[in-house]
């Protein structure tokens, strides 16, 4: 599995991040936006799985966590937000015994746009390492 600057289940605790949002309107609508898209329930199931299975909920599943090297390019990311995001990315990289985190330098959140070759290479490397 290749995760591209992915959100983590901790982001369900959106109230922890409400001071990060640039406007009051975003703060009030953001949770409803995700609920309307059906994203929140899927994140809740991931959280439950992680809490149930302990340190490595995905066992030996090979996982590559691609982390943007510069979220500040988004314009609204503060140093505190960047610190939290990097912490969440590190936590994602610990969900499997066979996971690795790759810090994609000179890339903002949209790695798939700015450095798509990193994603392709990561997928290819995972496939190459599989037996048979």
Please annotate each region the language model reported.
Residues 12-17, 75-79, 114:
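Short aromatic-enriched loop/helix-cap "lid" or pocket-rim segments at secondary-structure transitions
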Residues 59, 65-67:
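Short beta-strand/loop motif that positions the catalytic acidic residue
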Residues 35-55, 84-91:
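Active-site nucleophile elbow and catalytic-triad environment of alpha/beta-hydrolase enzymes
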Residues 73-104:
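Conserved loop-alpha-helix segment in the C-terminal half of the alpha/beta-hydrolase fold
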Residues 4-40:
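Flexible "cap/lid" loop of the alpha/beta hydrolase fold
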Residues 7-9, 69-72, 107-110:
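Short, solvent-exposed loop/turn segments at secondary-structure junctions
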Residues 97-132:
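Catalytic active-site module of serine/aspartate enzymes centered on a nucleophile-bearing elbow/loop
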